[in-house]
Design a protein with these regions (language model features):
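Aromatic- and Gly/Pro-rich donor/ligand-binding loops
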Residues: 2-131
Length: 131
Protein backbone atom coordinates (compact mmCIF):
# COMPACT_ATOMS: atom_id res chain seq x y z
CA UNK A 1 0.00 0.00 0.00
CA UNK A 2 1.27 3.42 -0.95
CA UNK A 3 0.01 6.67 0.50
CA UNK A 4 -0.58 9.73 -1.67
CA UNK A 5 -0.67 13.18 -0.06
CA UNK A 6 -2.68 15.73 -2.05
CA UNK A 7 -3.29 19.43 -1.53
CA UNK A 8 0.21 20.60 -0.75
CA UNK A 9 0.80 24.09 -2.11
CA UNK A 10 4.51 24.13 -1.45
CA UNK A 11 6.85 24.16 1.51
CA UNK A 12 6.74 27.94 1.75
CA UNK A 13 3.27 27.36 3.17
CA UNK A 14 4.50 26.33 6.62
CA UNK A 15 1.16 24.76 7.53
CA UNK A 16 1.39 22.39 4.56
CA UNK A 17 4.99 21.59 5.40
CA UNK A 18 4.07 20.76 9.00
CA UNK A 19 1.22 18.49 7.86
CA UNK A 20 3.53 16.70 5.41
CA UNK A 21 6.29 16.18 7.98
CA UNK A 22 3.90 14.95 10.69
CA UNK A 23 2.10 12.67 8.23
CA UNK A 24 5.35 11.06 7.12
CA UNK A 25 6.30 10.43 10.76
CA UNK A 26 2.93 8.80 11.42
CA UNK A 27 3.07 6.72 8.24
CA UNK A 28 6.61 5.55 8.89
CA UNK A 29 8.16 3.25 6.33
CA UNK A 30 5.22 3.18 3.90
CA UNK A 31 5.84 4.42 0.40
CA UNK A 32 4.60 7.99 0.53
CA UNK A 33 4.10 10.24 -2.47
CA UNK A 34 3.68 14.00 -2.27
CA UNK A 35 1.52 15.32 -5.10
CA UNK A 36 2.38 18.94 -5.70
CA UNK A 37 2.02 21.75 -8.18
CA UNK A 38 5.32 23.25 -6.92
CA UNK A 39 7.97 20.57 -7.50
CA UNK A 40 10.89 23.00 -7.33
CA UNK A 41 9.74 24.30 -3.97
CA UNK A 42 9.14 20.82 -2.56
CA UNK A 43 12.29 19.12 -3.84
CA UNK A 44 14.27 19.63 -0.61
CA UNK A 45 11.38 18.59 1.65
CA UNK A 46 10.91 15.35 -0.27
CA UNK A 47 14.62 14.55 -0.17
CA UNK A 48 14.81 15.56 3.50
CA UNK A 49 12.11 13.19 4.79
CA UNK A 50 12.09 10.45 2.17
CA UNK A 51 9.04 11.25 0.06
CA UNK A 52 8.57 10.51 -3.58
CA UNK A 53 7.39 13.58 -5.44
CA UNK A 54 4.71 13.59 -8.12
CA UNK A 55 3.83 16.83 -9.81
CA UNK A 56 0.43 17.46 -11.28
CA UNK A 57 -0.05 19.76 -14.21
CA UNK A 58 -1.00 23.23 -13.04
CA UNK A 59 -3.36 25.02 -15.39
CA UNK A 60 -2.23 28.00 -17.38
CA UNK A 61 -4.20 31.19 -16.84
CA UNK A 62 -6.04 30.59 -20.12
CA UNK A 63 -6.94 27.01 -19.08
CA UNK A 64 -8.17 28.30 -15.71
CA UNK A 65 -10.56 30.67 -17.48
CA UNK A 66 -11.65 27.97 -19.92
CA UNK A 67 -12.38 25.41 -17.20
CA UNK A 68 -14.07 28.03 -15.00
CA UNK A 69 -16.41 28.87 -17.89
CA UNK A 70 -17.10 25.19 -18.54
CA UNK A 71 -17.81 24.59 -14.84
CA UNK A 72 -20.25 27.50 -14.86
CA UNK A 73 -22.02 26.26 -18.00
CA UNK A 74 -22.15 22.56 -17.09
CA UNK A 75 -22.42 22.84 -13.31
CA UNK A 76 -19.77 20.11 -13.10
CA UNK A 77 -17.16 21.14 -10.52
CA UNK A 78 -14.53 18.58 -11.55
CA UNK A 79 -14.22 19.86 -15.13
CA UNK A 80 -10.53 19.90 -16.00
CA UNK A 81 -9.47 17.39 -13.36
CA UNK A 82 -8.85 14.66 -15.93
CA UNK A 83 -6.20 16.89 -17.51
CA UNK A 84 -4.50 18.00 -14.29
CA UNK A 85 -4.72 14.69 -12.46
CA UNK A 86 -3.86 12.14 -15.15
CA UNK A 87 -0.19 11.83 -14.26
CA UNK A 88 -1.18 10.97 -10.69
CA UNK A 89 -4.33 8.90 -11.24
CA UNK A 90 -2.43 6.58 -13.57
CA UNK A 91 -0.36 5.43 -10.56
CA UNK A 92 -3.04 4.97 -7.90
CA UNK A 93 -4.69 1.60 -7.27
CA UNK A 94 -7.45 0.47 -4.93
CA UNK A 95 -4.73 -0.85 -2.58
CA UNK A 96 -3.50 2.70 -1.95
CA UNK A 97 -4.67 5.48 0.34
CA UNK A 98 -5.19 9.13 -0.65
CA UNK A 99 -5.01 11.82 2.01
CA UNK A 100 -6.17 15.32 1.14
CA UNK A 101 -3.93 17.71 3.05
CA UNK A 102 -3.58 21.44 2.72
CA UNK A 103 -4.94 23.03 5.87
CA UNK A 104 -5.93 26.62 5.15
CA UNK A 105 -5.37 26.31 1.39
CA UNK A 106 -9.01 25.24 1.08
CA UNK A 107 -9.97 28.77 2.17
CA UNK A 108 -8.29 30.60 -0.72
CA UNK A 109 -10.38 29.35 -3.64
CA UNK A 110 -12.70 26.45 -4.39
CA UNK A 111 -10.61 23.24 -4.20
CA UNK A 112 -11.67 21.84 -7.58
CA UNK A 113 -8.58 19.64 -7.92
CA UNK A 114 -9.19 18.06 -4.52
CA UNK A 115 -12.87 17.58 -5.26
CA UNK A 116 -11.95 15.89 -8.54
CA UNK A 117 -9.43 13.66 -6.80
CA UNK A 118 -11.95 12.69 -4.15
CA UNK A 119 -14.54 11.82 -6.81
CA UNK A 120 -11.96 9.78 -8.74
CA UNK A 121 -11.11 7.84 -5.57
CA UNK A 122 -14.76 7.19 -4.82
CA UNK A 123 -15.46 5.96 -8.36
CA UNK A 124 -12.45 3.61 -8.32
CA UNK A 125 -12.82 2.20 -4.80
CA UNK A 126 -9.72 3.97 -3.48
CA UNK A 127 -9.93 5.00 0.18
CA UNK A 128 -9.47 8.73 0.72
CA UNK A 129 -9.79 11.14 3.61
CA UNK A 130 -9.56 14.83 4.36
CA UNK A 131 -6.47 14.80 6.55
Amino acid sequence: MAVFLFGNTGTFNRGCEAIVRASKKLLGYRATHLCTSNPEEDKMLCRDIGLQMLSFVPFSRLQNYKFAALRKITGEFTTGFETAGKQVTDLITSDDLCLMIGGDTYCYRPPYYHMGMNRYCEQHGIPSALW
